[in-house]
Amino acid sequence: MQACAVIAEFNPFHNGHQYLLEQARKVTKADLVIVIMSGNFVQRGEPALINKWERARVAINCGADLVVEIPTEYAIDSAKEFAHAGVEIAQKLGASFLAFGSENPDLDFENESKILDRQFDQRAKKYNQNFAAQLFDDTAIMNSNDILGINYAYWNSKSKRGLQLIPLQREQADHRDTEIKGSIASASAIRRAALEQSEYFNAVPKASLKAIRNAKLTSWEDFWIMLNYRLLTSTPQELRHIKGVTEGFENRILNLVDKSNSFTELMQKLKTKRYTYTRIQRSLTNILLNIQATPFNLTKTRLLATNQLGRIFIREAALGSVVMTKVTKEDFENNYAITKRADDLYQLVSPYQWGKGPIIKKNVKE
């Protein structure tokens, strides 16, 4: 069977996402669509609006055949490393295609990735590795979806087993839009509306609306006490070991945390021209979850949800060594220790029946 992979967050799943899955299947004529999805914390360095299991259930009910998880340490990383993990998983699963939304689908993504790679080397020589890495994550250069597309092309070119990249015209609002003006809206606008209990119903499929209404919605403010405690009991030396905390940023954080009464207030105090909100949020998430800089080492992915076609694909492609259907103690210690830590903290503010196996969709609507 030929599979088309889609790397996503679905935070939350909206009409634009459903269109993407439909087009991915239609354009590639793939036998099944695999979604490679962030877990309970997402790439902007914040908790997902609803838990990963419910988002995976929605994806399966809205066009995906198989949903697997990007481990937390990569899901909350820069666009470059987020893409690295997604492409790596897609290749390990034997996907033939990688489809993604783009504002400029005619862009030569492979050529752009080579240009960006050269610019990275130049910036790294002049400044440092951390500052240069922002180039692969810079939405001031172009839209975030195209930045991701370029990073997909970059990592795809590094592999012996390349995927066929399928950029698809994006049918959704700009990710920076904060208002909902119709049936197509940005995920950030929908999150804001859901948290403020204002109207967003026409912008999401029924399955997603049901999930949002029934779930405990989360935001960074739910984790403020945990983060505050972590910072107040940490030394600058300890924070320097945390991924993304460099160039004295640990001192700035510790100087401002006891002057802040909320997560939002701390973010406003920490923001500078050099430190964007997203970069700060990622650093704070790494602090909360005690994520330290380590070499890239992604060997397995966790199965979150599947239908019958997805189960057949896993069996026929002999993916048992790559896809964890049951997570063992050894897996948690070696492959999923950080993800388990993230899930345990998330559960404290958004209770869910953890420990269960993946969601299996039968031939009936769930």
Swiss-Prot record:
Locations listed in the record: Cytoplasm
Reaction it catalyzes: cytidine(34) in elongator tRNA(Met) + acetate + ATP = N(4)-acetylcytidine(34) in elongator tRNA(Met) + AMP + diphosphate
UniProtKB keywords: ATP-binding, Cytoplasm, Ligase, Nucleotide-binding, RNA-binding, tRNA processing, tRNA-binding
Residue positions binding ATP: 7-20, 101, 145, 170
EC number: 6.3.4.-
Job of this protein: Catalyzes the formation of N(4)-acetylcytidine (ac(4)C) at the wobble position of elongator tRNA(Met), using acetate and ATP as substrates. First activates an acetate ion to form acetyladenylate (Ac-AMP) and then transfers the acetyl group to tRNA to form ac(4)C34.
Protein name (record): tRNA(Met) cytidine acetate ligase
Species, as recorded: Pediococcus pentosaceus (strain ATCC 25745 / CCUG 21536 / LMG 10740 / 183-1w)
Taxonomic lineage: Bacteria, Bacillati, Bacillota, Bacilli, Lactobacillales
Gene that this polypeptide is encoded by: tmcAL
